[in-house]
């Protein structure tokens, strides 16, 4: 059976405590988790199982579902896979206990206002100018419902999120939602271009095409201890 758990935390909760709960769930092989904060926003994710993966660019990519005020969302078929990723395809998001955020690639991190995060993630993932410092793309052919084909440059980009042990849980949820919004925006653009209507109005078959063309990939490192 697919067993899940809820993590409901108040305004004072810190990511160090949440991580302890996640580790206990992983030890019990309960990997599907719904996070619920103080503002009724929810994020569903699959926890990576404990593994002795090597350091560097080995990451676990989890497809998240952002569920606004509901226990079910359009992306509820969450997917987890362990993959090896080139460094240029990893967009780092570092969030400390004071809410300060640094983003970018490993050799080009910069401090930003969290309100800029959605646009920064979107620019990295889409890489419309084919910048070699941003995410790679692989042109992929998809079968369309009702017949026909679609070619789309699928981004290889992954967002890697790291918090501190004293990062507020609400800040973590806010960042997760801002990251997911970037992918939602790209999906909406593709849906409008390919099917002539917003993503939320697509049929299930059309939505599956868009989700495969624009996969939502986020990896997480365990929170580090703030100094």
What name fits each language-model region?
Residues 1-227:
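Long, low-hydrophobicity, acidic/polar, solvent-exposed interaction domains
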